[in-house]
């Protein structure tokens, strides 16, 4: 609070004013971000349900969110784009939701290629997965080998550009690779 104002009362008021508008601002940003991930020009009535149903289904099916959103972008214009279908496919449980999504996007004003490009920009193919970060740190720390770290940094410099030759970096960890405690203690 002292950074906001020397007067504690004024600082508290200023901080509270920011806190008061946060929920609304968060909702606006969330809706815009989710619209991009779903390939929608904007959120309309029912889109919040479409989004929340997808997230619930992904959680229920224990789906990797990163791969699922990338695969959804592939489906925006099948047979084109960066296609990660061999890395991930939706289970049959997603069929009804995908039908709803197809119906919703068919009425959107943008072309399939515009939709797909927007979705790719909103959903990285590669993220700094804990098991990859830990392996890179261990390699550097134990062996003095910074090559895995440098490769990961290079890859994450362009996380939205899927490259088949680097597909191994897109996979979630196998059970034996799950990191239960990171170097920072989380």
Question: Whereabouts are the PLM-identified features?
Answer:
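Regulatory N- and C-terminal appendages and interdomain linkers associated
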Residues: 2-186
């Amino acid at each position: 609070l002292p950074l906001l104002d020397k007067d504690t009362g004024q600082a508290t008021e200023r901080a509270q004013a920011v806190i008061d508008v946060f929920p609304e601002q968060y909702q606006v940003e969330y809706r815009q971000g989710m619209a991009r991930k779903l390939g929608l020009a904007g959120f309309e009535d029912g889109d919040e349900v479409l989004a929340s149903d997808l997230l619930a289904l992904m959680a229920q099916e224990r789906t990797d969110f990163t791969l699922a959103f990338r695969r959804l972008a592939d489906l925006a214009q099948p047979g084109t784009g960066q296609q990660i279908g061999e890395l991930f496919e939706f289970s049959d449980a997603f069929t009804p939701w995908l039908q709803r999504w197809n119906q919703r996007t068919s009425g959107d004003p943008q072309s399939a290629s515009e939709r797909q490009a927007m979705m790719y920009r909103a959903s990285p193919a590669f993220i700094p997965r804990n098991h990859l970060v830990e392996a890179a740190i261990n390699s550097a720390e134990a062996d003095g080998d910074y090559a895995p770290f440098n490769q990961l940094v290079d890859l994450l410099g362009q996380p939205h550009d899927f490259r088949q030759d680097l597909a191994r970096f897109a996979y979630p960890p196998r059970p034996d690779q799950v990191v239960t405690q990171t170097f920072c203690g989380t």
